[in-house]
Amino acid sequence: MTENRNRCVITGLGMVCAIGNSVDETWNNALKGVSGIKNTKTVDTEGCYATLAAEVHDNTLDECPHADEMDRVSKLCVKAAKEALADAAYTIPEDEKKRVSVIMGSCVGGVNSVEAYYRNGEKAEDVTKMPISAIANEVAYIYGADGIVTNIANACAAGT
């Protein structure tokens, strides 16, 4: 068997989802059969036939660096990336930054910012929180990844 030097190795895991705010919490809740689907608390469902959602409840998201400049989805990804880097015991060395890439999967981008802008006519600079590309850009910026930074957007399965 020949050695392939062009490979990707997953060395750390990070997770924030409706049944946990870390890999361990999510795994333990999954083993217990915990469902994250509940009556929504963050979306106004008046006039809607659906009131259930798999919401992520995490009160630590505003601890992200420059959190006020990010949409909620970017904060979730920054938190998961932080856990993955810690799990891998990895800090990006200065001379390796161009070799570290961030590739995210999402199909909507900063939808909370889009909705706030539509409903309230928020500040013009808030449009920078909206694009799908903002998610991977924020993770790369905060952790110093200067390699390829992109987002895969191909329907709801993009994040799986």
Give the role of each language-model region.
Residues 1-149:
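Conserved "HGTGT" condensation-loop signature of ketosynthase/thiolase-family condensing enzymes
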Residues 151-155:
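Short beta->alpha junction loops
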Residues 159:
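Short conserved active-site loop signatures built around small residues
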